[in-house]
Amino acid sequence: MKSTLKKLLPFAVVGVISGATTVGGLQYFGHNSSNGDQSYFTTAAPNTSFAGMNTGAVGDDFVKAAKTTVPAVVTIKNYQSRTASRASEQDLFDFFFGDPFGGRGQQRQKQQQAPENMPSGMGSGVIISPDGYIISNNHVVAGANKLEVVLSNKKSYIATLVGTDPNTDISLLKIEEKGLPYLNFANSDNIDVGQWVLAVGNPLGLNSTVTAGIVSAKGRGIGILGSQGKATNPIESFIQTDAAINPGNSGGALVNTNGELIGINSAIQSTTGYYQGYGFAVPANLARKIVEDIKKFGIVQRGFLGVQSLDLSNDQLVTSYNKQFKTTLKVGSGIYITGFGENSGAEDAGLKKGDVITKVDNYDITDFADLSMSIGSKRPGDKVQVTYVRNGKEGTTSVTLRDQKGGTSTRTKADLSVTEKIGAEFDPLTERFKTEYGLNSGVVAKNVSEGSEMAKIGIVDNYIIIEVNGKPVNSQKDVEKTLEKYQGNVQVKFVDDYGRIYTKGFKMP
């Protein structure tokens, strides 16, 4: 079963998912840690310049852009509750077979669980409005129980996490202040390969660092959001730059020489974890759409074509597909439709298996990154013109995008199910498991979403939930029934993978 699933996974891409192969050495770079590496600083030879370049004009542009950008880029400190990394063997014995010390074991367990609030990491963020909205990366804020924002003038604030989107690695924070310096979004569709850009952030603890480079490529899919993040339907169409980017730059600004925001720095390609030539930024148009959704609806609105597909530009995938399905597809450009998901808008619009998508609206589709960007910036109910090739002939059809449940209207947080609101699903424990470990109730957490309420209190996949608000739960329906109309603080009693029992809470969204 596993081998069959593994073979099919590269081709069974439902909706719009980046299908690029993962580039070796790709890493997020949001969290700083002290290290003992020596730093070497060199000075360029006098009167050295690039041949044929008006260095004075470019330098003036850099200065203006830096003066605009630096005050609007902040440091974000991520604080998390730290607990003992492992439970002792006695803890496991106490939990499953009772406490032989008459309560002393339980007291010892509580002492080990006592959290220490301390900074876990640091990243960057960009102020995008004078009233304190800040955009950053999802991985910069993930797991935080407190977020501190430090401005370039060293003034500090405790931030509210407004929302996150692991599928694009974007988060939105808010601090209570007025009259803040901020950056305007540029139209990232209009950037050109080769144009000058500045990366501004707080790498390696060096606040307000500005580096320069060019746009090295556009529409780059690198496979990092699905492999290192918790994205279920990742959208990867990164701006690639050779501006120096290092740990701590995550969530910082990539700007043009006018000081306008063209991207949010997110990842680097490196074998060491430090700058080796290339960084990747989420395009401003996509980032802006995500934060607008979060502000307006409380959640991100995602439209889907509803196709299973193959990236014809990927030599490895095409070769594997041909071998497995005895086909003779040729490597080229475009997206080959291999099938359809449930409630597919593309299928209802007349697209068929074997069609090759070549354009969405006026956007040329050469690979998955192009398709994910063109659809990922849309909402359910939006219509797109899809150009395709069938049996050598070109056709066009209008597709109404749908959400993953087949709906064509936008939803707010109030429309979400209980499991969507708290960010997890649940499977029942088997009776054999309950009997073996002496449990009267319990469900197993699965598909815990990054940044969700369940994730914030430390629950991950495969943790056992025993009670919700003091009530035993044995199924997902039990959880939903307990919280369906509930407003207020939720108390969750759960067991981690070392057998330690916790009771933690969150406010029902």
Regions found by a protein language model. Give the residues of each.
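C-terminal recognition in membrane/secretory proteostasis and scaffolding
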Residues: M1-Y40, N117, S124, T160, ...
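Glycine-biased strand-turn-strand hairpin within the trypsin-fold
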Residues: G30-I134, A142-A144, K155, K178, ...
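Active-site loop architecture of trypsin-fold serine endopeptidases
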Residues: H31-S33, D37-Q38, P46-F50, N54, ...
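Extracytoplasmic/secreted envelope proteins and their assembly/folding machinery
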Residues: G59-A66, V70-P71, E89-D94, G98, ...
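Short, glycine-anchored, charge-dense loop/turn motifs used at functional sites
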Residues: V74, D131-Y133, N258-E260, G354, ...
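Short, surface-exposed secondary-structure boundary micro-motifs
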Residues: N78-Y79, H139, W196, N202-P203, ...
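Conserved active-site neighborhood of the chymotrypsin/trypsin-like protease fold
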Residues: M118-M122, I127-T209, K359, I365-A369, ...
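Short beta-strand segments of a lipoyl-like beta-sandwich/carrier module
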Residues: Y182, G213, S237, G252, ...
